[in-house]
């Protein structure tokens, strides 16, 4: 099932800006390593002019969940929570899985 692992945040916590930049490089290196092995897409990062950010990788859900459930990835998540305001990590349905979700949602509406 195609999935996107998406991280959002508003800005670095004041006083931790330098460490947040180092953290961004660390996260990209971890996930780029897995992308080179064909386990996920290359990381993509987006910023607004106000500094809000979005970071994501895509891949098969079971593979992304397995990679996210490693000690190194769990530590990266904890660091993100300590360095970035409003840090949020979520898994999204993507590609055909998103279309399938919409069909299931439509079917579920019949019960309301």
Regions inferred by a protein language model and the residue ranges of each:
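Short, mixed-charge low-complexity intrinsically disordered segments
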Residues: 86-87
């Amino acid at each position: 099932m195609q999935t996107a692992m998406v991280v959002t945040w508003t800005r670095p916590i004041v006083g931790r800006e330098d460490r947040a930049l180092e953290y961004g490089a660390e996260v990209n290196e971890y996930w780029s390593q897995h992308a080179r092995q064909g386990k996920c897409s290359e990381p993509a990062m987006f910023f607004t002019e106000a500094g809000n950010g979005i970071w994501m990788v895509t891949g098969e859900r079971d593979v992304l969940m397995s990679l996210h459930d490693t000690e190194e990835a769990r530590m990266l998540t904890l660091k993100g929570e300590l360095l970035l305001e409003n840090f949020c990590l979520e898994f999204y349905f993507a590609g055909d899985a998103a279309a399938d979700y919409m069909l299931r949602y439509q079917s579920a509406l019949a019960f309301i």
